[in-house]
Amino acid sequence: ISLTKLKKYEVKFNELENYVDQLRFNKQYQDSLMLYLMTEYKFRNEISSFKWIPLKKFKGFKIIGNYIVVGSKRMFISRGEFKTDKIHGRTQTEITNKLLQSDIRRHIKPLEEDTNMFLNTKGESYTNHDLSQRIGRLTEKKFGVSLGTSSINSIFISSLDKDTINKLKELSVNRGTSINVLVSHYFNDI
C-alpha cells in the first residue's frame, strides 16, 4: 500500500495496538499474537516460520531457523532466517513484556516443541505469503485497508515525534555519523 493511500485511511499506531487487545479479548489468540509480534518488534513476515523451544534445549542446540525460546523466567526470539540475515547474522530479541510472554505461553501450550507456532485452519504451517494474507484480511476488516509489514512499520515511524527524529538527523550530520551509531553509543548512557 502506498504512503499516500495509507494517509487517506489515517490508521494510527495506537489503533493497531488496541486491535491486538480486541483480538485477544475475542479469543482470536493466534491472530492477536501474530499482530502483537509485528507491532511490538516490527518483524517482517518471517514470524510465520517461528517455532518454539524450551530454553534448556536451546542451550545445546545447533539453531538454524527462527525460534521463540521459552524458559521459566526468560523468553527471547532467536532469528537466523530473515530478509537481511546475511548482513546481520543471528539476532536475539529479549521478550520482557509480561502480557506478550503470557500470550506466547498460552499459545504454545497445546503445541509440541520445535514445531511451527502459526498454523492455518488445516493445521498446516503458515508461509510468509499466508501470514501476509491473513494480516491483510484482518486489517482490512477492521480499518478498511489491507496492511502488510511495511505499512505497519510506516505507521509506527509516522507515530514518532518528528522533532526528535529531525534533531537526531541533524546531530548525525553534524557529528558525521549515522543515527544507528548515535543510538547504540549514547542512549545506553542515559
Q: How would you name each of these model-derived features?
A:
Residues S49, S132, V183-S184:
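Key DNA-contacting residues within the recognition helix of helix-turn-helix
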Residues K162-T164, L168, V173-I190:
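Catalytic-site neighborhood detector that most strongly recognizes the C-terminal catalytic loop/helix
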Residues F50-N97:
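Conserved tyrosine-mediated DNA breakage-rejoining catalytic core shared by Y-recombinases
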Residues Y9-E46:
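Basic, Lys/Arg- and aromatic-enriched nucleic-acid-binding interface segment
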Residues H88-F156, D161:
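Active-site/catalytic core of tyrosine-dependent DNA strand-transfer enzymes
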Residues I1-Y19, D85-L99, E113-D114:
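DNA breakage-rejoining catalytic core of tyrosine-based enzymes
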Residues S32-T39, S154-K162:
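Contiguous, well-ordered alpha-helical segments that form the cores/surfaces of helical PPI scaffolds
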Residues F25-Q28, E40-I47, W52-F61, P110, ...:
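Secondary-structure boundary elements
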